[in-house]
């Protein structure tokens, strides 16, 4: 019996150490971050939490022995998968140029007319990207844009007073540099049982709780100010050149209850290796199928609605998460730094994560 108890104690100790190896020290987890409600007129949302506490959590991961940098963006090109909701992205190289009277030569590119680079490829949504109408629009009458309301109660007149105006409020330039701790949830392993999640399949709040426990993050959980990345495996469908046109036609995503769960935990941003964050069943974009079960009526992109207009949480779409998941880097320091385009509703972004692969030994606490 004594030997048996010792064996149980050893297993418990090893399990505890495994959990500790995946997370920041408790003293860093307990550092206080600012909490809502935010001041009237706020345009930062949950990014108000970025500060000393999140920087210290981030710095711990950077200093971990064996820490490496992971690219979380897809390579952009003229033949990459393209969103059906944005103008085509075509980069046109210009001939090499020179400056008369000098020995200089230089190269540059232009974008095609109508291009929307901020909504193509790996990109981030500003809080002013999404609004909510008083009731569903029938698509036949003119869009009642004047009825739109945004995060913080801003009206259409506040945010976009004329059809051709940039965002006057909630534009991307209001977002601070996101430098904070991140959690990666491996939904391909937990929900998909090792297979790519199916189109329209959802990651629920219960799944998130289960993944945290399975990945040794049960005690840490999701901290205020975290960025959460969810690896669905759908990024495997990202092919360049995009000949089969599957990637943007459908996708797995977060369930509405998962969006509410993450919002309650005050994350700063959510990122998926999928194009919509929301689940999109096959046929939904063509109008031949409805949204995923559990989606509120009239809000087929309910996660966009909740995160952007209600909670002030940014979206990173088309993130590249396969290497982070392969190395089981469940927690890391992430940096998300889009261009500060004034009045922009979205931007190209090159997020990175810095963390130590799980297979490497971690330093003692």
For each feature predicted by the language model, list its residue ranges.
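Bacterial N-terminal signal peptides that target proteins for export
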Residues: 1-8
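Hydrophobic h-region of N-terminal signal peptides that target proteins for export
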Residues: 11-21
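Active-/binding-site microenvironments in catalytic and ligand-binding cores
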Residues: 23-365
